[in-house]
């Protein structure tokens, strides 16, 4: 096996010369002589043919070549480097197989981390980096959440249009493997629209709703209704379906599905998964009103058999959305607490009343402790006078 060429210890001119010779030897249409127009032109020529090393080279060898190109690229001033960086990023998306895609991912990650944090080019590198990460199933290695994403661009925030484009890509690369993360991305995307341009976000809004409904771990759907692009969907079937998941019970969904079966299926939603989610949401809503529920009530409200009640409640408890206790002997479920499906004015008033009651109870306790303390001091003084 041929040794891996390493050019990093050479001067820029020498690296360029060696790279030209290397690619020409591989059969690329490139001169082995340096350009008289400077390093930028050399890089353009080298990047233009660099994919030839994907044909027969070993991953470690290719990584060394790409590392050399990156080491030259990061020396180019920002005002002259944009086209070079974009051309390189585009080449990295052309890896013919997964092992080489991982090499390209490492190269782009190396470039991303070596660019100045205030460089606007980091956005373009990251966008292509996500594309390559999808090719080799490494998305979660480069994207773990919206907060992490924003922190990476804190010194040079991309434009709203750029972030919208990136959020759409992130949704696309996570929707099949991490619905919860994908749903959060879409909500963040819709949050980038204003009242002036929300009307053009129809497709994004529909994707956001569908992703949230399909996610088995997303139950608090009420915040979606306040997003401006979602408001523009009022009157559409997708908005009606969302409203059912926000505040209605299982029978409403069953009726909707019977009336609009083709629509639900066309959105890529799974009816059985929808039923499972609506049963849980219905149980949560019942738990808000009834501290105690019989098995008979649950079989009727949830449209399940009596032998399915206990397994269902156990699954609900695993979500930690509801705290409850099964009473098999009396065929009842005792509710301790539940998360509210919606959190509007009534819930805020309830929370206010609860906090006010706590405040009054604490005041009573403090007053009682003060009285006890005073009584003990008086008793101590009296006993001292007696003795």
From Swiss-Prot:
Please name the SMART domains in this protein's record: PINT (SM00088)
- Chief localization: cytoplasm
Identify this protein by name. Eukaryotic translation initiation factor 3 subunit M
The protein's organism comes out as Drosophila virilis
Q: Which UniProt keywords are present, listed alphabetically?
A: Cytoplasm, Golgi apparatus, Initiation factor, Protein biosynthesis
Function in brief: Component of the eukaryotic translation initiation factor 3 (eIF-3) complex, which is involved in protein synthesis of a specialized repertoire of mRNAs and, together with other initiation factors, stimulates binding of mRNA and methionyl-tRNAi to the 40S ribosome. The eIF-3 complex specifically targets and initiates translation of a subset of mRNAs involved in cell proliferation.
Tell me which residues make up the PCI domain.
Answer: 181-340
As one GO molecular function, the record gives: translation initiation factor activity
Q: Answer whether the UniProt record assigns the keyword Acetylation to this protein.
A: no
Its Gene Ontology cellular component terms are: eukaryotic 43S preinitiation complex; eukaryotic 48S preinitiation complex; eukaryotic translation initiation factor 3 complex, eIF3m; Golgi apparatus
Q: How does it assemble?
A: Component of the eukaryotic translation initiation factor 3 (eIF-3) complex. The eIF-3 complex interacts with pix.
Family annotation (SUPFAM superfamilies): ARM repeat, Winged helix' DNA-binding domain
Residues spanning the membrane: none
Asked whether the UniProt record includes Protein biosynthesis among its keywords, one would answer yes
Q: Where in the cell is it found?
A: Cytoplasm; Golgi apparatus
Question: What family is reported?
Answer: Belongs to the eIF-3 subunit M family.
The UniProt entry's GO biological process terms, in alphabetical order, are: formation of cytoplasmic translation initiation complex
């Amino acid at each position: 096996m041929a040794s891996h060429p390493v050019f990093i210890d050479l001067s820029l001119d020498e690296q360029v010369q060696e790279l030209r010779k290397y690619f020409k030897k591989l059969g690329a249409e490139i001169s082995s002589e340096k350009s008289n127009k400077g390093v930028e032109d050399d890089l353009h020529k080298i990047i233009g043919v660099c994919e030839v090393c994907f044909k027969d080279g070993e991953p470690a060898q290719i990584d060394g070549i790409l590392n050399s190109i990156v080491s030259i690229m990061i020396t180019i001033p920002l005002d002259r480097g944009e086209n070079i960086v974009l051309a390189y990023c585009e080449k990295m998306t052309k890896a013919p197989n997964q092992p080489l895609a991982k090499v390209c991912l490492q190269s782009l990650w190396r470039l991303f981390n070596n660019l100045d944090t205030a460089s606007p080019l980091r956005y373009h590198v990251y966008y292509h980096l996500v594309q390559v990460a999808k090719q080799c199933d490494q998305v979660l290695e480069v994207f773990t959440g919206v907060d992490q994403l924003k922190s990476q661009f804190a010194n040079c925030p991309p434009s709203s249009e750029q972030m919208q484009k990136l959020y759409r890509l992130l949704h696309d690369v996570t929707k099949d493997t991490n619905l919860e993360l994908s749903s959060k991305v879409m909500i963040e995307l819709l949050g980038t629209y204003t009242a002036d341009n929300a009307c053009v976000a129809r497709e994004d809004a529909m994707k956001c709703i569908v992703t949230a409904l399909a996610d088995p771990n997303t139950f608090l759907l009420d915040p979606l209704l306040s997003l401006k692009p979602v408001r523009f969907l009022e009157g559409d079937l997708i908005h009606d379906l969302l409203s059912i998941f926000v505040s209605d019970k299982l029978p409403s969904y069953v009726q909707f599905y019977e009336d609009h079966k083709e629509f639900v299926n066309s959105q890529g939603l799974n009816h059985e998964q929808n039923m499972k989610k609506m049963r849980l949401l219905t149980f949560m809503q019942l738990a808000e009103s009834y501290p105690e529920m019989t098995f008979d009530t649950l079989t009727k409200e949830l449209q399940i058999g009596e032998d399915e009640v206990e397994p269902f409640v156990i699954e609900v408890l695993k979500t930690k959305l509801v705290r409850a206790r099964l009473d098999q002997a009396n065929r009842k479920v005792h509710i301790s607490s539940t998360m509210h499906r919606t959190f509007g004015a009534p819930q805020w008033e309830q929370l206010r009343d609860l906090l006010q009651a706590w405040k009054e109870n604490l005041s009573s306790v403090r007053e009682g402790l003060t009285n006890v303390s005073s009584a003990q001091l008086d008793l101590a003084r009296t006993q001292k006078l007696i003795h």
